[in-house]
Amino acid sequence: GLHMDLEVVYIATCKMQQAERCHTNVALMASTLLVEQHVKFIQQLEQKRDSSLAYHMTAHLRMNGVYWGVCALELMRAGDALDREALIKFVLSCYDGLTGGFGAYPSHDAHILSTLSAIQILALKDALDELGERRTRIVEFVLSLQRQNGSFQGDKWGETDTRFLYCAVSALAHLHALDKLDKEKTIQWLLRCSNFDGGFGLTEGAESHAAQVFTCVGALSILNALDRIDQDTLAWWLVERQVPGGGLNGRPQKLEDVCYSWWVLSSLSLINRLHWIDADKLQSFILSAQDPDRGGIADRPENVADVFHTQFGVAGLSLLGYEGLERVDPTYCMPYSVTRKLHICLLYTSDAADE
């Protein structure tokens, strides 16, 4: 028995020492954004175009993935890390001439999610002019997805979700075609997706979720209708997403996740309540989810990094005013420099206006 006990104590001691070593690493990491590693991480994703199963399994997200990578690079002031011409060529190769939208990958059906990402990649690369004649078709494709009740479907198959509505409204804004949208009908639908707790769900009557809150608040922001929601109740719901460790979760009783640094923060920023959150603790949480060896940011510390969490971690840090990053526009999740150039930027915070 004694031998067993000693072994248990020995193992426990080793684990504690390991944890302490880990802790020192985390403390070091938790103070700086490892820009160089993250840039390399994104560049390597681009080079992984091989026959690996993982690559093909994520083909339906490829356009989104490229946007996440390109936007993160621009926010880290490393836009030149990927070849501009190759990016533009890839985006245009995903255009679906049949429907007028963009697919996630060449010869995939058009979808509103990949259509917005395609437009954003071109905007990030100052290449929207490359759309040429396609521009009108894209606007028609986006408008064709709106239903009678004001909601939007993602493609011709008909599933609706407030994410699709946000993508549609943002895409139209980027293409300067908001005047063609029935704004009031769209706003009415968004308001019907709000809940008594102040949050928003993916459709009427659905549970409040932070990602859907952003899509609704972001769309209302573009449509200049933020005065039509109960901002205080919403802000309280958003602030309650911060867990004791500093991170944010998407709804009550769930684990914290780096991507909510964006969904929650951008929403708070749009209703001018960013200061309601403990920014230092959140910043430490995001930085502690970095992979110091391979680069990239994970959903939470010790997990595997991916481009999605890298983008939203970096964007969250930008909203928190992290030094050395481009300022991000909370409405579009694009650098202010880009939305200003397109004249679609709606300045919320005085500090952004001062830049």
Language-model-derived ranges and their functions:
Residues 2-114:
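Internal amphipathic alpha-helical repeat/solenoid segments
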Residues 62-73, 111-123, 161-172, 209-221, ...:
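Well-ordered alpha-helical segments within folded domains of soluble proteins
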Residues 348-353:
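Conserved small/polar residues in nucleotide/adenosyl-binding loops
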Residues 215, 219-336, 343-344:
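Structured C-terminal portions of repeat-based eukaryotic scaffold domains
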Residues 38-57, 93-108, 142-159, 190-211, ...:
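Glycine- and aromatic-rich loop/turn segments at beta-sheet edges
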Residues 28, 32-35, 56-66, 81, ...:
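Alpha-solenoid helical-repeat scaffolds
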Residues 75-85, 124-136, 174-187, 222-235, ...:
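Structural helix-adjacent loops and short alpha-helical linkers that scaffold large soluble proteins
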Residues 93-171, 184:
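Extended ligand-binding groove/face enriched in aromatic
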